[in-house]
Amino acid sequence: MPPAKYNPGSDVRNALVGSGSIINGTVENSLLFKKVFVGNNCVVKNSIIMNDVYLGDNTYIENCVVESNTTIRANTVHKGEGEIKVVVENTERFNI
C-alpha cells in the first residue's frame, strides 16, 4: 500500500495518518486509519477516522469517531458536543 499523500494546500498538525490516505484539507489532533480520503476544504479535529472512509469536500468533523466504510457527503457537519459522536453513513463507496 502506498504511503499517505498530502496534496498542496493540506494542513496536518498533531495527527497520525495511515497509509493509502489522501489529504486535501485540514487535520488536527486526530487519528486517521488506512485509506481515508479527506476532500478539499475539509476540517477534521479531535477525531478518529477508521479505515476506508471518504470525506467529501467542505466537510467539518469534530469530536467524532467515524466508522469504517463510511462516506460523508460534501458540505456536511458532524460535531460532538459534550461527548463523542459516532458517525456511520454507508451510502456510497470509493476506491483509492
Regions found by a protein language model. Give the residues of each.
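Left-handed beta-helix
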Residues: 1-96
